[in-house]
Design a protein with these regions (language model features):
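Blade/loop signatures of beta-propeller domains
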Residues: 1-12, 39, 132, 190, ...
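Beta-rich, blade/repeat-based domains predominating
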Residues: 10, 15-31, 57-76, 80-81, ...
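Beta-propeller fold detector
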Residues: 12-15, 52-57, 92-96, 148-152, ...
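Beta-propeller domains
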Residues: 29-56
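Residue-level marker for isolated small/hydroxyl-bearing positions within beta-strands
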Residues: 35, 75, 120, 172, ...
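Short, solvent-exposed loop/turn segments at conserved positions within beta-propeller repeat blades
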Residues: 37-38, 77-78, 124-135, 174-177, ...
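A short loop-to-beta-strand structural motif that recurs across blades of beta-propeller domains
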Residues: 41-43, 81-83, 136-139, 178-180, ...
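Short loop/turn segments immediately following beta-strands, especially the blade-tip
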Residues: 181-189, 272-280
């Protein structure tokens, strides 16, 4: 862990009293965006450490990321869609249906260097009688708008991230308590699903595999029981960052991408690391 985290590094609480926050993403203009799902707000944490409302209502936004043009890509629970915020502030729908049926409640997403958007679609934001698909998928949205179902056999797919070379796709299977990994084929589809790591620890506080990110050396960071779990590229547990609340998601921040921002139930935290994270949108 000393290669990743200095002994003197301390977790810093930045803000609190939120309802349930998720989906942090660092914008290169120098601020962090994150979602408060039940409050129906996307917040902005500024360089002078102030919290401002970025968007209300947010469509009960959950996960956020950026595309190659630094436009905000959002998974919206309430609107059951993946949206994009244009440069003029207009919010447009990128995907809300698969084969004519409404998506469940898009949860988290990642953008590949070719511009395609990969996202998870569990049921956390809808009731059973609102579901139309009958499964919880992982999808690829191509730059031309074509939506492809990649995986439909995970219990509740959640956090999602690529390895630095984009040859592997990691997906958190939250309720089952593990991270799945897939090989990415040249056409963008995935194959060879297998177990990457289990994140189960009855001795710690609550939490399941939720948010997921990868650093430039291929180490995998996942929220889980007790805080943030850090795993080597081969799935070995390197260590954990303890968080006093249930951690939900995480994002690399600052210009060097060596600050790890962590959303927890009601609070926002950060800690400095030694290795930079993979840049959103590549």
């Amino acid at each position: 862990m000393q290669r990743i985290l200095d002994d003197s590094a301390k977790l810093e609480k930045l803000a609190g009293d939120f309802q349930f926050i998720e989906g942090p993403i660092w914008h290169p203009d120098g601020f962090l965006l994150f979602s408060d799902i039940p409050a129906n707000i996307i917040y902005k944490f500024t360089s002078n450490q102030q919290v401002e409302v970025f968007r209300r209502p947010s469509g009960k936004a959950n996960g956020n990321t950026l595309d190659k043009e630094n436009r905000l890509i959002t998974a919206e629970h309430e609107n059951r869609r993946v949206s994009r915020t244009e440069k003029d502030g207009k919010v447009i729908t990128l995907a809300d249906r698969y084969e004519g049926k409404r998506l469940n409640s898009p949860n988290d997403l990642v953008v590949k260097s070719d511009g395609s958007i990969y996202f998870t679609d569990p049921s956390y934001g809808v009731s059973k009688d609102q579901e139309e698909l009958g499964f919880y998928g992982v999808y690829r949205l191509a730059p031309d708008g074509k939506l492809t179902l990649l995986v439909k056999d995970l219990v509740l797919p959640n956090g999602i991230a690529f390895s630095p070379d984009e040859q592997k796709l990691y997906v958190n299977n939250s309720e089952a308590g593990y991270i799945a990994v897939f090989d990415v084929k040249p056409d963008g589809t995935v194959t060879n699903q297998r177990l990457f790591a289990e994140l189960k620890d009855a001795a710690t506080k609550g939490g399941v595999p939720d948010g997921l990110k990868v650093d430039l050396e291929g180490n995998v960071y996942s929220t889980g029981p007790g805080g943030v779990w850090i795993l080597s590229p081969d799935g070995k547990l390197l260590g954990r960052i303890s968080v006093p609340e249930t951690a939900t998601n995480l994002a690399w921040g600052e210009s060097d991408r060596k600050t790890l921002y962590i959303t927890a139930n009601t609070s926002l935290y950060r800690i400095r690391l030694k290795i930079a994270g993979v840049r959103a949108g590549k």
